[in-house]
Amino acid sequence: MNIAIRSYTRSGNTKKLADAISGALNIEAFDVSVPLSEKTDILFIGCSYYAFDVDPIVKDFIVNNKNNIGKIVCFGTSAMMKSMKKPVTKVAKTVGIAVSDEEFHCRGRFGKIHKNRPDADDLKDAAEFAKKVVQ
């Protein structure tokens, strides 16, 4: 099974999750600025909400790499929202990519809100989530 990990982060919160998933699966995680060089069965894509949507950079990544994405598995952080799946699915659907029902999400630090998140427990949970998805 070919698996890839990509993420986009402004604060560093989602990168922490990407690194935890990377360590659990022994697969290098990259920023969305790095295109997929080959077909992936599963793409773990991490992002957060910015103005109640995913960043246009993430949307562009999905569209520009559509021919190399089998299925998307979302992960992410945010201070307020509880899922990245809906906005990612909206984009993926336009280019015919399936999005897994499985998703990992945790709180992320935003100013004084949710200090120290994601924390060690969140990172452990993200790693366990990734292992479960690829079993």
Where are these regions (language model features)?
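FMN-binding flavodoxin-like domain, especially the glycine-rich phosphate-binding loop
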Residues: 3, 9, 13-28, 39-135
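Short amphipathic alpha-helix with an adjacent loop that forms part of the alpha/beta core around
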Residues: 33-39
